[in-house]
Regions:
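Short, charged/polar surface micro-motifs in flexible loops or helix N-caps
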Residues: 14, 45-46, 53-58
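Short aromatic-enriched loop/helix-cap "lid" or pocket-rim segments at secondary-structure transitions
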Residues: 49-51, 94
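Short, low-order "capping/linker" segments at domain edges
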Residues: 84-94
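A short beta-turn/loop motif at secondary-structure boundaries
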Residues: 38-44
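Active-site-flanking beta-strand signature of metal-NTP-handling nucleotidyl enzymes
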Residues: 3-10, 47-49
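Short, surface-exposed ligand-recognition loops at beta-strand->loop->(often short) alpha-helix junctions
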Residues: 9-23
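An amphipathic, aromatic/His-enriched active-site/gating alpha helix that lines ligand/cofactor pockets
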Residues: 26-37, 51-85
Length: 94
């Protein structure tokens, strides 16, 4: 079975950073309880990393976008094209 690796960069507003980090931690623990998932923080960004079965990708993305819609007021836009996230997904090789 093919595994997918997804990396999503998010940039919370400075005054909302801790609130957003708490929200995404709670959401990932709830939604990705059976999958491998990690969160990384930098001074300005939160980066979510998830490994999942390829069959779950479409459903997980739909659920993730719905959750993200509720969090957009806490996030800064990167630019007019990427908006609030910079995502990357592909086949896990190793």
């Amino acid at each position: 079975m093919t595994k997918k690796l997804s990396i999503v960069r998010l940039k919370p507003k400075p005054e909302c950073f801790d609130e957003f980090l708490q929200n995404i931690r709670a959401w990932q623990l709830q939604v990705h309880a059976d999958d491998d998932h990690l969160l990384m923080r930098t001074n300005e960004e939160v980066v979510a990393v998830v490994v999942r079965d390829s069959e779950m990708l479409h459903e997980n993305i739909q659920r993730g976008v719905a959750w993200l819609d509720s969090q957009r007021p806490l996030l800064q836009e990167y630019n007019e094209v990427d908006r609030h996230t910079i995502p990357m997904t592909g086949d896990l090789v190793i």
